[in-house]
């Protein structure tokens, strides 16, 4: 992998959120109660960490997530959720794949986890970007029967692009493999692949097991015991992140829904700062003028919060706001701290063909999609005025500075990173260096 890419893609604050176990339905049921006293207070006695399962379709990500909840449920650290409870959408069950990201809550002896189960199907890879963008670390699942596959590589690339630095490997379906040399080959390939994408492949924990055996209570050495080894590795290898608590509150909007008689709830992952009930907020993005509102309730995993803080996946009940006034990609922010913009100067790295990017160059007026926080917006790219030759081509593997015009106002800040996608694949990544308008 180009040495330039890791330099451009250093660790940043994680910038997006997903649904908490189809978050809208969970918080909807909670907020629809006549009073919020229904919800227990959220326990903050353990460090809170956001992790997730990534990897190729059908390699067992959702089965592993279910196996983790079953194993920890026996120890009082989770509520058991089977495969169907995690893949709740009818289309997901019918096709046997995860389409949107779903969140599960559990605890080990050391930590409280919010676990996002990311889709592996190529048609829904952009939803995986949202899931990956909120992880403090990740478990990449690879089937022993297949080894690394195309989405194994793409998920590692996406995880690297959004700032995930620590990866634990779970080699799944080992109950179907009789040849130990095949398992050794899969481990060797995964270590090489991690190194190729800028991770520490030499030292990353690799756990061999079978999520299905853990679910069905068979072969405990590769079932339940392997799941506990995996969780121990996650506890030890993925560091507890330092949260950005001292800056003004900001939470990107992931999902929106209405609660009859209560108001509108926005769900998302708090990017920075703190929020308390009764505080005033601005909703920024899409509109030229921010919307003003007041927070009337905060909950996480069906538990009431007095306040939300950076790293929390929360539902926020807003006063006087209709659902049709809000869109995914907006942000909730402390009044006066964030503005929406339509033109920026950005430093871009265009992925090479070998990195899964474009096979050919592009010129001025290129129109890809920009993924930034939870926003997905079309941009028109042009060379800065200082560039003499506006007819030149930007080639795969290039670093280049471009002016980007966004088709609608989007909350942006200098220093933010974003992904560029076109035709169902990631083609580049960028860093905002200047706000123009």
UniProtKB/Swiss-Prot annotation:
* Keyword hit for Protein biosynthesis: yes
- Coiled-coil spans are none
Residues recorded as binding GTP, renumbered to this chain, are 55-62, 117-121, 172-175
Subcellular location per UniProt equals: Mitochondrion
Annotated region described as G2, given as residue ranges: 96-100
What does UniProt give as GO cellular component? Answer: mitochondrion
**InterPro entries, per this entry?**
EF-Tu_GTP-bd (IPR041709), EF-Tu_GTPase (IPR050055), EFTu-like_2 (IPR004161), EFTU_2 (IPR033720), G_TR_CS (IPR031157), P-loop_NTPase (IPR027417), Small_GTP-bd (IPR005225), T_Tr_GTP-bd_dom (IPR000795)
Q: Where is this region: G3?
A: 117-120
Region of interest: G1? 55-62
Q: Name one GO biological process term.
A: mitochondrial translation
Q: Which UniProt keywords apply?
A: Elongation factor, GTP-binding, Mitochondrion, Nucleotide-binding, Protein biosynthesis, Transit peptide
For the region G4, what residue ranges are annotated? Answer: 172-175
Q: Where's the tr-type G domain? A: 46-242
User: Where does this protein act, in terms of pathway?
Assistant: Protein biosynthesis; polypeptide chain elongation
The record describes its post-translational modification as: The precursor is processed in two steps involving mitochondrial intermediate peptidase (MIP) and mitochondrial processing peptidase (MPP).
Pfam families, per database record = GTP_EFTU, GTP_EFTU_D2, GTP_EFTU_D3
Region of interest (G5), ranges? 210-212
PROSITE patterns to which the protein is assigned, alphabetical: G_TR_1 (PS00301), G_TR_2 (PS51722)
What NCBIfam families does UniProt report for this protein, alphabetically? EF-Tu, PRK00049.1, PRK12735.1, PRK12736.1, small_GTP
Misc remark: Present with 58527 molecules/cell in log phase SD medium.
What is the documented function of this protein? G-protein that, in its active GTP-bound form, binds to and delivers aminoacyl-tRNA to the A-site of ribosomes during protein biosynthesis. In the presence of a correct codon-anticodon match between the aminoacyl-tRNA and the A-site codon of the ribosome-bound mRNA, the ribosome acts as a GTPase activator and the GTP is hydrolyzed. The inactive GDP-bound form leaves the ribosome and must be recycled before binding another molecule of aminoacyl-tRNA. Required for mitochondrial protein biosynthesis and maintenance of mitochondrial DNA.
List the protein's name.
Elongation factor Tu, mitochondrial
What does the record give as the organism's lineage? Answer: Eukaryota, Fungi, Dikarya, Ascomycota, Saccharomycotina
